[in-house]
Design a protein with these regions (language model features):
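Threonine/glycine-rich low-complexity segments that form extended coil/beta-edge repetitive scaffolds
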Residues: 1-10, 14
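Proline-poor, low-complexity alpha-helical tail modules
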Residues: 155-159, 208-239
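Active-site beta-strand/loop architecture of penicillin-binding DD-peptidases
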Residues: 2-5, 203-206, 210
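Short, compositionally biased, intrinsically disordered N-terminal export/targeting signals
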Residues: 1-4, 144-146, 191, 227-230, ...
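Structural flexibility/helix-modulation signal
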Residues: 19-26, 32-205, 217, 239
Length: 239
């Protein structure tokens, strides 16, 4: 910004972009997203608990505490295995992250900023949806690559903030729509709760522990959505 003093002398005032703050806000959003997508993939791809029925009191009394715990854990860990609702949410998230946005006449995608998932065969188990930022010193996979994101922030912060704001707003909005109350799923659940209750109502007492597990999942996912929203708000406040 150029201004003049009362003596008619020109003074130039420059404002530096807080590259680190914007970078951290974006990285925080990916940290929360990666945690969420990985946990969902783990739940969806969990091992089958076929043959493991909820234990009766008599069956529990004939087993050790350790045996009961392992048995029930096997059931709980598979509650969301191959769940249609969860799969739909996962696909929505992954499709949204592949979106591109036009800003000032130019199209941008995550790859424009050096952000991508690993190859199908090189990524770890349940990590095919996890994103890595080139040049991230804390990421052993991409730390040696050129830091395109930081360079983009330094040269054109408005475009960077605009892109990531649009991207994560889309993800957050679509997730909210997917998880809204419907005839088959209650709000903010990732399994067909109403359908399950109808099909297995006679086992209400036997699946109480399983229901507690589901509640834990719901709380976990909701907290991650909130964390993503908080990170998005911080990013929007940078400009």
């Amino acid at each position: 910004v150029t201004a003049k003093t009362k003596d008619d002398e020109q003074v130039t005032i420059t404002t530096d972009t807080d590259v680190d703050a914007i970078y951290k806000s974006i990285k925080d959003m990916f940290t929360e997203y990666n945690k969420l997508i990985k946990s969902m993939d783990e739940a969806y791809n969990a091992d089958s608990s076929k043959g493991y029925e909820p234990l009766t009191d008599d069956e529990k009394s004939a087993m050790t505490d350790d045996e009961v715990e392992k048995w029930e854990t096997k059931i709980k860990d598979s509650l969301l295995r191959k769940d249609d609702t969860l799969n739909s949410i996962i696909n929505t998230m992954k499709n949204d992250m592949a979106s591109s946005f036009t800003i000032n006449g130019k199209s941008y995608a995550l790859s424009s900023f050096g952000i991508a998932t690993q190859g199908y065969f090189s990524s770890g188990e349940n990590e095919k949806g996890v994103y890595h930022i080139d040049g991230d010193s804390e990421d052993s996979v991409t730390s040696g690559n050129d830091d395109k994101l930081r360079a983009a922030i330094a040269s054109d912060p408005e475009t960077v903030v605009s892109f990531f704001s649009q991207l994560f707003t889309k993800v957050y909005t679509d997730l909210g729509n997917k998880m809204a109350t419907s005839s088959i799923s209650s709000a903010y659940t990732v399994y067909n709760d109403k359908q399950m209750n109808k099909q297995y109502s006679e086992y209400t007492t036997k699946i109480s522990d399983a229901e507690n597990k589901i509640t834990t999942w719901e709380d976990y996912y909701y907290s991650k959505f909130s964390a993503m929203e908080s990170a998005l708000s911080k990013l929007n406040s940078q400009t």
